[in-house]
C-alpha cells in the first residue's frame, strides 16, 4: 500500500500503518476460560438490551403495518 497525498501521488517505500492483530494478546487458556465463565447477574443483564431494542423497534413495525393495511 502506498501513501498518497492530496494529488494522489504514490510515495515509494511506504507500506501503510501497521495493523493490529486481534486475539493474539494474552494466554489462550485464559481467553478460553473467560469465555466459559458464568455470566454475573444472571439472565437479566443479557435480556435488558434485547428488550430495549424491541421497544425501540415498535414504532417502525407499527408504521409498516399501518402502511400495509392502508394499501389493501
Curated annotation (Swiss-Prot):
The record marks 27-28, 42-43 as: Cleavage. The keyword DNA-binding applies. InterPro entries: Adenovirus_late_L2_mu_core. The keyword Manganese does not apply. Coiled coil: none annotated. GO terms for cellular component: viral nucleocapsid. It is found in: Virion. Pfam families: Adeno_PX. Keywords: DNA-binding, Late protein, Virion. GO terms for molecular function: DNA binding. It comes from the Viruses. Residues 2-27, 43-72 form a propeptide. Its main location: virion. Belongs to the adenoviridae pX family. The role of the precursor might be to condense the viral prochromatin for encapsidation by virtue of the two basic domains. This is Late L2 mu core protein. It comes from Human adenovirus A serotype 12.
Amino acid at each position: 500500500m502506498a501513501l498518497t497525498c492530496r494529488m494522489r501521488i504514490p510515495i515509494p517505500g511506504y507500506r501503510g500503518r501497521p495493523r493490529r492483530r486481534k486475539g493474539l494478546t494474552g494466554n489462550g487458556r485464559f481467553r478460553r476460560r473467560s469465555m466459559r465463565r458464568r455470566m454475573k447477574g444472571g439472565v437479566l443483564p443479557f435480556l435488558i438490551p434485547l428488550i430495549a431494542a424491541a421497544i425501540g423497534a415498535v414504532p417502525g413495525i407499527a408504521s409498516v403495518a399501518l402502511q400495509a393495511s392502508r394499501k389493501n
